[in-house]
């Protein structure tokens, strides 16, 4: 399964580890992903999403129904 947030579409970023001597070695910055179940009252079922901590805060702010509508508008199947 890819490491992508279903709400924010955040993906791993690439950069460098920098040692004390400023040697650069490539590394990946991974998103803070969690698998979380949300109860959707309008559909009378649970929906499982793989999302970042920021994605959870967006759902708290907008509501699960609005966020699911945006995800489905992008063409993702839930």
UniProtKB/Swiss-Prot annotation:
GO terms for molecular function: structural constituent of ribosome. SUPFAM superfamilies: L28p-like (SSF143800). Disulfide bonds: none annotated. Keywords: Ribonucleoprotein, Ribosomal protein. GO terms for biological process: translation. InterPro entries: Ribosomal_bL28 (IPR026569), Ribosomal_bL28/bL31-like_sf (IPR034704), Ribosomal_bL28_bact-type (IPR001383), Ribosomal_bL28_sf (IPR037147). One of its GO terms (cellular component) is cytosolic large ribosomal subunit. Belongs to the bacterial ribosomal protein bL28 family. This is Large ribosomal subunit protein bL28.
